[in-house]
Amino acid sequence: MKRRDVIKTAGLALLGSVVAPIDSYSASTKSLNNAFNSDELNGVSNKRKLGMNLEVSSIGLGVQNMSRTYQTTIPSRTEMINIIRTAYDKGVTLFDAAVASGPFEVERILGDAVVPFRDKVVIETKFGWNIDQETGNRLPGLNSHPDHIKRVVEGMLKRLRTDRIDLLYQHRVDPQIPIEDVVGCIQDLIKEGKVLHYGLSEPGIKTVRRAHAIHPVTAIQNEYSLL
C-alpha cells in the first residue's frame, strides 16, 4: 500500500471515531460501517508488531471523545459501545484510552464495550496528568510519582474491567520525576502482571534512551494529525 493510501485509509478510520460521537445513533453507525466497508480499508485486518511481541491491527480506535466532544455534546453511551464493537467486528484490535479523558469515563465505556472479546484485543491507556483519583478533579500540572502511578493503575483496572493493561503510556513526561523512577515503577507493575507493556507519549529522544535502558519501550505516541 502506498504512503498516500495508508494516510487516506487511516484518515477514514479516524473520521469514524471523530465524527460518530456527535451524530445521531443511526447516522453515526452507518458512517462507521461505510468507513470500515470501504475498499480502501482492506488493510484494516493487517497486523503490526509493536516492540518485540505485541501484535495489533494496523489501525486502532481512539475513544477520547466518547464521553464528551469538543462541542460539549454528550454522546450516547449505548452508541459509543456499539461503535467500539463495530470496529472490532471490522478487524480493529487496538483501542486507545486515557485517564484524563472524562476523566475516567472513556475507560469505563471501553471496559464495558470489550467484555465479550477482552482477550482478543489490546487496550492501551495513559497516566501522567495530576488528577484526583477519588473525585476526578483535575489538579495543576503533571503527576508521575510512583505512588500515584500505582493508584492510577488500580483505578484503570477497575474501570476497564480487566486484570491487566496491555500497553500503559506515560501521557506526558513529568520534569519533576526522573524517568528512571517512572520506568522502575512500571517495571514493578509488569512483574505483578498488572501491566504487560509500556510506552511514552511526546517524549524527547534522550528520555526515550534513558527509559529504554531500564526496560524496553514498546511504543512511542506523538501528535500527528491525519485530518
List PLM regions with ranges.
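Short, acidic/polar
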Residues: 74-86, 145-158, 208
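Beta/alpha (TIM)-barrel catalytic core signal, keyed to glycine-rich beta->alpha loops juxtaposed to Asp/Glu
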Residues: 4, 44, 179-227
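Conserved, mostly hydrophobic/aromatic
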Residues: 61, 95, 110, 123, ...
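N-terminal binding-site loop/beta-alpha segment at the start of enzyme catalytic domains
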Residues: 2-122
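Generic structural signal for well-ordered alpha-helices
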Residues: 84, 107, 111, 153-154, ...
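Active-site groove signature of glycoside hydrolases
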Residues: 158-174
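Acidic-and-aromatic substrate-binding clefts and catalytic sites of carbohydrate-active enzymes
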Residues: 98-106, 174-178, 226-227
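Active-site beta-loop-alpha junctions enriched in small/polar residues
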Residues: 64-66, 100, 126-130, 170-173, ...
